[in-house]
């Protein structure tokens, strides 16, 4: 079970869909996009609040310009991220043509964490970099976590602009409520003239043309604030430059440079990570 990720069955018909099993919950565009197709090697800082994969049941309905999803969930197959909750997402695509698309979305959810505890952390958009970790530590007395997310995606020829805001409001007993949040904005450019692709409310494998090769450069700024009241997890703003070299549909070489401007409990953290 430790290696299982997406394990689900789904029925679809006339725009309606029902899915049962373990799947990515309908919140946070960067999470819903496969890591094979994301602009950067790691997700933006707001991913600290993402629900990721949970076991549950989802109903969805899609039209040419709208997509609605509603999901009820609990823990996952790894026995982590325990807590029952529900989340909904509404996506509007006023226009959606290959190489010319606008995606706007709103999501909201509520969760009752198992054992009334919660924890949020981040490794500054480069996995394995422990020394720059932001971490709230274990928060006790958490009755409920309410998440809210905003998404925007614009594809215009070789350019892709994407941004999200994600917020977590914690209702706590005897410790005071807390509001934590983060956002990012990023821009990608296919120097080779190719363009990003989109399907079912998320990014798909780029349109790489006949030879299947492409070069893309990208920039991102993102922020995360895990400080509010008695919660002192730190805050940071990151600046990232990236390059992707596609050698076909299944091979991508990527490099990212991240400058971190962070602080946690009075200690400044400003590393450069490659």
Per-region residue spans from a language model:
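Outer-membrane beta-barrel pore domains
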Residues: 117-274
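Outer membrane beta-barrel
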Residues: 1-114, 180-210, 216-229, 234
């Amino acid at each position: 079970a430790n290696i299982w990720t997406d394990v689900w069955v789904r029925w679809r018909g006339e725009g309606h869909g029902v899915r049962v099993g373990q799947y990515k919950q309908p919140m946070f565009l960067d999470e819903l996009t496969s890591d094979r197709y994301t602009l950067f090697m790691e997700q933006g800082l707001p991913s600290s609040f993402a629900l990721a994969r949970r076991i549950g049941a989802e109903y969805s309905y899609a039209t040419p310009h709208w997509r609605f999803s509603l999901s009820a969930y609990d823990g996952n197959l790894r026995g982590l991220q325990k807590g029952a909750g529900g989340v909904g997402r509404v996506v509007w695509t006023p226009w959606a043509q290959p190489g010319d698309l606008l995606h706007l979305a709103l999501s909201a959810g509520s969760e009752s964490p198992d054992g009334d505890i919660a924890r949020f952390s981040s490794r500054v958009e480069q996995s394995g970099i422990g020394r720059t970790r932001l971490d709230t530590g274990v928060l006790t007395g958490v009755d409920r976590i309410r998440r809210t997310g905003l998404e925007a995606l614009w594809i215009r020829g070789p350019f892709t602009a994407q941004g999200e805001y994600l917020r977590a409001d914690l209702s706590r007993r005897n410790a005071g409520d807390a509001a934590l949040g983060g956002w990012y904005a990023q821009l990608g450019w296919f120097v080779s003239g190719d363009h990003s692709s989109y399907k079912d409310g998320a990014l798909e494998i780029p349109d790489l043309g006949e030879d299947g090769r492409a070069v893309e450069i990208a920039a991102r700024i993102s922020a995360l604030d895990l400080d509010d009241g008695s919660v002192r997890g730190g805050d940071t703003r990151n600046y990232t430059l990236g390059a992707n070299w596609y050698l076909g549909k299944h091979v991508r070489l990527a490099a990212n440079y991240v400058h971190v401007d962070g602080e946690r409990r009075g200690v400044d953290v400003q590393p450069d990570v490659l």
